[in-house]
Swiss-Prot record:
Residues modified as Methionine sulfoxide: M49
Record bears the keyword Signal: yes
Subcellular location: Secreted
Protein name as it appears in the record: Apolipoprotein A-II
GO BP: any one term: phospholipid efflux
Pyrrolidone carboxylic acid modified-residue sites: Q24
Subunit structure: Monomer. Homodimer; disulfide-linked. Also forms a disulfide-linked heterodimer with APOD. Interacts with NAXE and NDRG1. (Microbial infection) Interacts with HCV core protein.
Species of origin: Homo sapiens (Human)
Amino acid sequence: MKLLAATVLLLTICSLEGALVRRQAKEPCVESLVSQYFQTVTDYGKDLMEKVKSPELQAEAKSYFEKSKEQLTPLIKKAGTELVNFLSYFVELGTQPATQ
């Protein structure tokens, strides 16, 4: 009986010490996590800026924008003329009853 009581007492003390150690363990601080996140973002930004500075990437971007401009210019002109026609239709519609 004494052996059983001693065993239970020993197990209880060990589990309490384990809980105490867990409570005393340093948890990761929110500030350090945020700081680490911003440091990672800053590093990625620096890497991206180095990649953007390469002349071949700049030439590729320039050709892409020129190609896009060539394709979009006729569409924008067409949309502009259709908008003017649409608005002039309503202007004419509004002036017709006044003249009759």
